[in-house]
Amino acid sequence: MSPVEQIVECVPNFSEGRDARRVLKIVEAMNVAGVHLLDFSMDVDHNRSVVTVAGTPEGVREAAVRAVGKAAELIDLTGQTGEHPRIGAADVVPFVPVAGIKLEQCALLARQAGAEIWKRYKVPSYFYEAAASRPDRALLEEVRKGQFEGLREAAVKDASRRPDVGGPGLHVTAGACAVGARRFLVAYNIYLDTAEVAVARTVAKQVRASGGGMAGVKAMGVLVHGRAQVSLNITDFEATPVGEVYGRVKALAAEIIGLIPAAAWVPESEWARQIEGFVPEEKILELRLRHPLAWPA
């Protein structure tokens, strides 16, 4: 029996969602042999872009490292603002096992990537989730506490807040990078039938796990295009299906950011019908792997 091909997904998030030229240059930097571009999107209000690539472990690791370097070159956090919390120009870089590879191996990839990022670009890294160096860093929100502005001071003054690789301080303009390994998650944004962001924040507090809400759910309330939005990460869609989250929130519309595993997609469900502009061949991971995007020229 021939060995199963190893496929790793990486979904880096960058703190730039308003300058398409910068984002395209970052995407171009990820064009590495053995790596396929599956998706990328920009959000003006969050001032954030999300890129999804998949391929061989070594190729994906190299693509991620190059992307962080290009982001550090192009993005200056000292003048950057947006709705989304962030600590770095390349804010989070998660490695996700897709086929023929274990989560623990992805954690090793993450640690290798963090070391290489520091070696090449002097951008420090914090390891989170399965790659975390200690229990209190498993949660991304704990790593990102204080955001760039607060962490750049805390990392120097408080030894417990220093990066896992590099430092002790952050990169002056590019901050730090949270590099980790995790399983699939569903990035799901729900728009409420109101312009009151306070309502979205209340709903987010009620549904997120840290507030005693739903298992494996992270949420925050923001204002996007004049509409209140509950921005969610469903980190365990088997324990808490997307439909259950939808059932707790009165939605005007919704969107999926990045790709969604086929196992999480229920096309006949009410929540699925609320998704704006959903094309299965473009948004379901297994289908997109068959027909990846062309790299930007």
Please place each PLM-identified region on the residue numbering.
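Long, contiguous binding/interaction regions
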Residues: 2-297
